[in-house]
């Protein structure tokens, strides 16, 4: 047990401090913005301090553990802890949420509620990544859905209510399977119902039962990741949501699905995972090709970026299915890498929309001349998205490739076939990325003539873009920033598998 409750403070602070926003004066937008940003900064500094001074990198076990009795009736505990798998997503959450609150500066309608919902979402996400009790994980998973639904339905495009309803139907449907899986695992292990992660990891289940649990958890995480064919909420949601909400969705929300797959499906249910992993591999390769070939057909800029997210999630799925140290490390690196790149692309798409008020790519063109800074940043992040060497996306995809090639589970021919199909997907990625840049920034359209209302990015937007760009370059140059966090934990997870 940790003496000082670092994690409880980190989880509770945003929603607790955020509740005071509702008492701030109604007209004081500036006060509300600064208050929210200060809370996010304080939270990020607290998290960084706790991890720098109280987290040992070479220890693969759970650290900063807090374990309090909550409900005696069925041994439900408030149990939090951090290990090498969850430290990356927690820091990513803090970083992206702080920048998303800065990106939400222009929001003036109901800004008190908007900023409170962002902070409530922050608490739910950090709680999901750090909970060590299955029911607590489920509660945090659900807590984070309510703010997202309200953010989607109240701020965004004309069809925002439709996309918010679609989002909540998909995710609530997935959550039913998650709850069934959590209760099944908790009740079937022994005479005493136990929802503790540590005891569940050491349980052995009959194979048929483990497969049923695996499918239940998989459906819940497949909606969130998203995995084909449960991905259709994503383009609609991203197409309509406000861009600061999009940053949180692309940067953190999707990563919760990948985190759940590794944390529960791989760690708790290793036998079922080794049975299903070839199918995951096939679905992952289909997803890369499908999304990369669907993306060029999208007229809406944000929908095109959303399909690129679906394509990148295929790499995470393949890394998880490879059951190798290298592949799983590559998947974790891709989780962090895409968190930065996806958030930045949606932010830049949103700031461009604020200026030119156009959504469809075929109506744009020639925007590079009046907005050179936005053009430069957009081009840079598009290159990062198509895995240009020297950027984080390239390292992550190469490590996933190596993970498949070195996997002991698959025969040579299937490995060659999967690698070949993935390579085709990597060729399709530049096609939609570069055509998006060409349609938006080049050519001759209305924006070649000087306009009073089309102006370049200001210091706030430039600060957000550069803040995200630095870690993308940093991880691309020196991936051990992220890999050193997870490498021991990955070895621990894979020690449960037979062939190594």
From Swiss-Prot:
Keyword set includes Cytoplasm: no
Pfam families: Proton_antipo_M (PF00361)
GO biological process: ATP synthesis coupled electron transport
Residue ranges of the TM segments: 4-24, 37-57, 87-107, 113-130, 134-154, 167-187, 207-227, 242-262, 272-292, 305-325, 330-350, 386-406, 416-436, 462-482
GO CC annotation terms, alphabetical: chloroplast thylakoid membrane
Catalytic activity, as annotated: a plastoquinone + NADH + (n+1) H(+)(in) = a plastoquinol + NAD(+) + n H(+)(out); a plastoquinone + NADPH + (n+1) H(+)(in) = a plastoquinol + NADP(+) + n H(+)(out)
Location of this chain's protein in the cell: Plastid, Chloroplast thylakoid membrane
Topology with respect to the bilayer: Multi-pass membrane protein
Entry-linked InterPro entries: NADH_Q_OxRdtase_chain4 (IPR022997), NADH_Q_OxRdtase_chainM/4 (IPR010227), NADH_UbQ_OxRdtase (IPR003918), ND/Mrp_TM (IPR001750)
EC number(s) stated in the UniProt entry for this protein: 7.1.1.-
The organism's place on the tree of life at top rank: Eukaryota
Membrane is among the record's keywords: yes
Coarse class of the protein's main subcellular location: plastid
UniProt KW keywords: Chloroplast, Membrane, NAD, NADP, Plastid, Plastoquinone, Quinone, Thylakoid, Translocase, Transmembrane, Transmembrane helix
GO MF, one example: NADH dehydrogenase (ubiquinone) activity
Family named by the database record: Belongs to the complex I subunit 4 family.
HAMAP family named among the record's database cross-references: NDH1_NuoM (MF_00491)
Listed name of the protein: NAD(P)H-quinone oxidoreductase chain 4, chloroplastic
Organism of derivation: Lactuca sativa (Garden lettuce)
Encoding gene per record: ndhD
């Amino acid at each position: 047990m940790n003496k000082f409750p670092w994690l409880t403070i980190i989880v509770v602070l945003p929603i607790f401090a955020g509740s005071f926003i509702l008492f701030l004066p109604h007209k004081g937008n500036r006060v509300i913005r600064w208050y929210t940003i200060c809370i996010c900064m304080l939270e990020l500094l607290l998290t960084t301090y706790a991890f720098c001074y109280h987290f040992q990198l070479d220890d693969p076990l759970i650290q900063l553990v807090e374990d309090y009795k909550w409900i005696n009736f069925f041994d439900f505990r408030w149990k939090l802890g951090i290990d090498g798998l969850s430290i990356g997503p927690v820091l990513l959450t803090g970083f992206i949420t702080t920048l998303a609150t800065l990106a939400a500066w222009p929001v003036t309608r109901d800004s008190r509620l908007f900023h409170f919902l962002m902070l409530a979402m922050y608490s739910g996400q950090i709680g999901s990544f750090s909970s060590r009790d299955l029911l607590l994980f489920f509660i945090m998973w659900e807590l984070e859905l309510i703010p997202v639904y309200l953010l989607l339905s109240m701020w965004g495009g004309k069809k925002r209510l439709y996309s918010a309803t679609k989002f909540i139907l998909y995710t609530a449907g997935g959550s039913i399977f998650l709850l069934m899986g959590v209760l099944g695992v908790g009740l079937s292990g022994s005479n005493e119902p136990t929802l503790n992660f540590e005891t569940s990891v050491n349980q052995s289940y009959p194979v048929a039962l483990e497969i049923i649990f695996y499918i239940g958890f998989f459906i819940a995480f497949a909606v969130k990741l998203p995995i084909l064919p449960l991905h259709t909420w994503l383009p609609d949601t991203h197409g309509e949501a406000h861009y600061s909400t999009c940053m949180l969705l692309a940067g953190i929300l999707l990563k919760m699905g990948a985190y759940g797959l590794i944390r529960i499906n791989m760690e708790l249910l290793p036998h079922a995972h080794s049975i299903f992993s070839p199918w995951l591999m096939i679905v992952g390769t289909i997803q890369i090709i499908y999304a990369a070939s669907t993306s060029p057909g999208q007229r809406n800029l944000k929908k095109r970026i959303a399909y690129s997210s679906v394509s990148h999630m295929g790499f995470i799925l393949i890394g998880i299915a490879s059951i190798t140290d290298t592949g799983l490390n590559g998947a974790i690196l891709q989780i962090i890498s895409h968190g930065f790149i996806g958030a930045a692309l949606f932010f830049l798409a949103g700031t461009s929309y604020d200026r030119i008020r156009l959504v469809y790519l075929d109506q744009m063109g020639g925007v590079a001349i009046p907005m050179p800074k936005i053009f430069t940043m957009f081009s840079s992040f598009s290159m990062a998205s198509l895995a240009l060497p020297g950027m984080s996306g390239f390292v992550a995809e190469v490590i996933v490739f190596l993970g498949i090639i070195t996997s002991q589970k698959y025969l040579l021919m299937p490995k060659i076939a999967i690698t070949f199909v993935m390579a085709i997907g990597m060729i399709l990625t530049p096609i939609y990325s570069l055509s998006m840049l060409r349609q938006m920034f080049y050519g001759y359209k209305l924006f070649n003539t000087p306009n009073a209302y089309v102006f370049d990015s200001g210091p706030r937007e430039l600060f957000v873009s550069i803040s995200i760009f630095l870690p993308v370059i940093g991880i691309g140059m020196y991936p051990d920033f992220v890999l050193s966090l997870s490498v021991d934990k990955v070895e621990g997870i894979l020690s449960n598998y037979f062939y190594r």
